[in-house]
């Protein structure tokens, strides 16, 4: 029989033409694997396809029908055959049922393997009844349970065979005849397996009870984030059976920089880690994956936001003025580097002040008056800046000057003095005008001045005065107003005539009020014995010496004050010159044969000259010697 079979195979013709593999598969299904074609009942059905090219018709459907009818297909490709097509035709697993060689001579290289695999498939067909009703349950990512119904006849044991549909090592083990269920372990996650269960009696095997099932994916980790701080958080997950480790990755959800997630790997016994060096007030996405050798589970992802850094508390704004306010806050526990105080108006950019960590207050200066300020205080740490704590306050109106005082009033002027409203006044604007007049005078003073002399005023006129403070932000205070009347024009007072001589009188008076231009002095003998004479002196003087007067004569003297617009007033007094006086106490002494010494007391007044007359008592001519008025002695010689 063996000889005739080999002879029949050797005589098989090699027919050229089209490659219609699908048609050939349909042919053997319809013509060969039939009892009427000579197939023995319960015989193993094995088909071996040998082709040297890619089929021109469909092979998937015909090969599937054959497999569904229990035919075990081997596919052998030579030279131009399509390897993908061969694996599609062949029964799983591919490594024992699909072959591809470069040419016909290379067929010898696969003969041994092919023979073994064919023989293994042929073994034990007989009449042994196979198990039935294959049920696969209790699926996990690493295992599942296989159950079956035993055959009606007793068996010695069961053989369980399994391998991945996609190809891989075929594994098998035996189960006691008393068991009708077993668990396949150490499977690959999310992998479809072929399962064959055989009845075994001695060395005879039944047809396999076939089935397929897919393991579950690696379980998704049950993830929990807790114990969250400003820069840390803890991550915990439910352990996964069979895991060889875990990968924890994390990154901010929103970031301005393109950065890779940070990652840590931990062993299979660790299911709780702390993430450190995180950014405060930042949402993080945390992903945990279980690692099973070269496989990883689907990622379990959660998001959580770190807490903000501790911020100052109880911010208060006090001591508010038109340009300043003080900021107070409660200190922060922790490693604060400094505090930052920011403030702004709705129209201005933010300004900021840095404050040493040892202080909990600061003053804001140069603020705008009557303006709403938003003030915030933040604590700065090595890790970043805390959220701000804010407060609002409106600055006060700029203060006006106070206590306007008018002094030194004259007919043409007076002095105004006031107290500063604040220390930061830039300028003062002062206006004045007669009461009711719209024609106002104005001047500007520096902010450190607080007095002004108002000049060129009209006598006996009520004036209104207004003082306005102007501040650095150009805000103006309310007006400080006052009024004062200038003095009326006046004449001199308290006229005195004194220090009379035989030809002069001294006149003195108290000055008239206001800005006197001149004083006019008129004088003449009281009895009308001479013409009236006039002299003028400057307005700053208040005395004059009238000279070249007549001796022993009473004089009437009038002093008038002269203002720019006329005479202010006058005052009259009287004085009398002294009579002319001769010398007194004339003495002649120290005579000699030709000289005499003469001495006298000065005459009153201011004599310009003395005339000394002398003559012999016995008779003779009289001699005259002129003597200067400041000398009161002479020596008469040549007597």
Curated annotation (Swiss-Prot):
<dbReference type="InterPro" id="IPR013783">
    <property type="entry name" value="Ig-like_fold"/>
</dbReference>
<dbReference type="InterPro" id="IPR050991">
    <property type="entry name" value="ECM_Regulatory_Proteins"/>
</dbReference>
<keyword id="KW-0964">Secreted</keyword>
<comment type="function">
    <text>Type XII collagen interacts with type I collagen-containing fibrils, the COL1 domain could be associated with the surface of the fibrils, and the COL2 and NC3 domains may be localized in the perifibrillar matrix.</text>
</comment>
<feature type="domain" description="Fibronectin type-III 2">
    <location>
        <begin position="220"/>
        <end position="310"/>
    </location>
</feature>
<dbReference type="InterPro" id="IPR036116">
    <property type="entry name" value="FN3_sf"/>
</dbReference>
<feature type="domain" description="Fibronectin type-III 5">
    <location>
        <begin position="491"/>
        <end position="585"/>
    </location>
</feature>
<keyword id="KW-0677">Repeat</keyword>
<dbReference type="GO" id="GO:0005581">
    <property type="term" value="C:collagen trimer"/>
</dbReference>
<dbReference type="InterPro" id="IPR036465">
    <property type="entry name" value="vWFA_dom_sf"/>
</dbReference>
<feature type="domain" description="VWFA">
    <location>
        <begin position="1"/>
        <end position="114"/>
    </location>
</feature>
<feature type="region of interest" description="Disordered">
    <location>
        <begin position="473"/>
        <end position="496"/>
    </location>
</feature>
<feature type="domain" description="Fibronectin type-III 4">
    <location>
        <begin position="402"/>
        <end position="490"/>
    </location>
</feature>
<dbReference type="InterPro" id="IPR002035">
    <property type="entry name" value="VWF_A"/>
</dbReference>
<dbReference type="Pfam" id="PF00092">
    <property type="entry name" value="VWA"/>
</dbReference>
<dbReference type="Pfam" id="PF00041">
    <property type="entry name" value="fn3"/>
</dbReference>
<keyword id="KW-0272">Extracellular matrix</keyword>
<feature type="domain" description="Fibronectin type-III 3">
    <location>
        <begin position="311"/>
        <end position="401"/>
    </location>
</feature>
<comment type="subunit">
    <text>Trimer of identical chains each containing 190 kDa of non-triple-helical sequences.</text>
</comment>
<feature type="domain" description="Fibronectin type-III 1">
    <location>
        <begin position="130"/>
        <end position="219"/>
    </location>
</feature>
<keyword id="KW-0379">Hydroxylation</keyword>
<keyword id="KW-0176">Collagen</keyword>
<keyword id="KW-0130">Cell adhesion</keyword>
<comment type="similarity">
    <text>Belongs to the fibril-associated collagens with interrupted helices (FACIT) family.</text>
</comment>
<dbReference type="GO" id="GO:0007155">
    <property type="term" value="P:cell adhesion"/>
</dbReference>
<dbReference type="InterPro" id="IPR003961">
    <property type="entry name" value="FN3_dom"/>
</dbReference>
<protein>
    <recommendedName>
        <fullName>Collagen alpha-1(XII) chain</fullName>
    </recommendedName>
</protein>
<dbReference type="GO" id="GO:0005576">
    <property type="term" value="C:extracellular region"/>
</dbReference>
<keyword id="KW-0325">Glycoprotein</keyword>
<feature type="domain" description="Fibronectin type-III 6">
    <location>
        <begin position="586"/>
        <end position="639"/>
    </location>
</feature>
<keyword id="KW-1015">Disulfide bond</keyword>
């Amino acid at each position: 029989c063996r000889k005739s079979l080999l002879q029949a195979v050797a005589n098989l013709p090699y027919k050229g033409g089209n490659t219609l593999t699908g048609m050939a598969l349909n042919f053997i299904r319809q013509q060969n694997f039939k009892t009427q074609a000579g197939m023995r009942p319960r015989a193993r059905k094995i088909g071996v396809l040998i082709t040297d090219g890619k089929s021109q018709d469909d092979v998937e459907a015909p090969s599937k029908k054959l497999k569904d009818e229990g035919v075990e297909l081997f596919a052998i490709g030579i030279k131009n055959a399509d390897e993908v097509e061969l694996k599609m035709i062949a029964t799983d697993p591919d490594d024992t049922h699909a072959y591809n060689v470069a040419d016909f001579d290379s067929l010898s290289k696969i003969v041994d393997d092919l023979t073994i695999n064919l023989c293994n498939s042929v073994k034990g067909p007989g009449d042994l009844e196979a198990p039935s009703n294959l049920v696969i349950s209790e699926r996990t990512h690493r295992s599942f349970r296989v159950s079956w119904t035993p055959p009606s006849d007793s068996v010695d044991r069961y053989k369980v065979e399994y391998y991945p549909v996609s190809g891989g090592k075929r594994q098998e083990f035996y189960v006691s005849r008393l068991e009708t269920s077993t668990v396949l372990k150490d499977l690959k996650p999310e992998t479809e397996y072929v399962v064959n269960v055989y009845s075994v009696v001695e060395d005879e095997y039944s047809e396999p009870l076939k089935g397929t099932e897919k393991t579950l994916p690696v379980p998704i980790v049950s993830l929990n984030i807790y114990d969250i701080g400003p820069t840390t958080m803890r991550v915990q997950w439910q352990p996964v059976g069979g895991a060889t480790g875990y990968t924890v990755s994390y990154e901010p959800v929103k970031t301005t920089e393109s950065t890779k997630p940070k990652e840590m790997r931990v062993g299979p016994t660790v299911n709780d880690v702390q993430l450190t060096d995180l950014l405060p007030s930042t949402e993080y996405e945390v992903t945990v994956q279980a690692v099973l050798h070269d496989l990883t589970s689907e990622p379990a992802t959660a998001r959580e936001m770190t807490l903000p850094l501790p911020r100052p508390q109880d911010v208060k704004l006090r001591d508010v003025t038109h340009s300043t306010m003080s900021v107070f806050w409660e200190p922060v526990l922790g490693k604060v580097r400094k505090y930052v105080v920011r403030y702004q108006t709705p129209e201005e950019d933010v300004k900021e002040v840095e404050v040493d960590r040892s202080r909990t207050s600061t003053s804001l200066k140069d603020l705008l008056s009557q303006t709403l300020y938003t003030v915030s205080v933040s604590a700065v740490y090595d890790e970043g800046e805390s959220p701000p704590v804010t407060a609002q306050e409106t600055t006060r109106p700029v203060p006006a000057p106070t206590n306007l005082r008018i002094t030194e009033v004259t007919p043409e002027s007076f002095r105004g003095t006031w107290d500063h409203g604040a220390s930061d006044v830039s300028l003062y604007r002062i206006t004045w005008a007669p009461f009711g007049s719209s024609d106002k005078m104005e001047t500007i003073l520096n902010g450190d001045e607080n007095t002004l002399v108002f000049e060129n005023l009209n006598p006996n006129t009520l004036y209104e005065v207004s003082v306005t403070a102007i501040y650095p932000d150009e805000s103006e205070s309310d007006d400080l107003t006052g009024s004062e009347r200038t003095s009326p024009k006046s004449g001199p007072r308290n006229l005195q005539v004194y220090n009379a001589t035989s030809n002069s009188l001294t006149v003195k008076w108290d000055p008239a009020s206001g800005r006197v231009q001149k004083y006019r002095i008129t004088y003449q003998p009281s009895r009308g014995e001479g013409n009236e004479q006039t002299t003028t002196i400057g307005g700053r003087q208040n005395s004059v010496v009238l000279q070249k007067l007549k001796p022993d004569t009473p004089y009437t003297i009038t002093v008038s004050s002269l203002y720019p617009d006329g005479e202010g007033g006058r005052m009259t007094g009287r004085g009398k010159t002294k009579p002319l006086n001769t010398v007194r106490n004339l003495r002649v002494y120290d005579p000699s044969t030709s000289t005499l010494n003469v001495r006298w007391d000065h005459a009153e007044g201011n004599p310009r000259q003395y005339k000394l007359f002398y003559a012999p008592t016995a008779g003779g001519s009289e001699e005259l010697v002129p003597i200067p008025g400041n000398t009161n002695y002479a020596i008469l010689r040549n007597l």
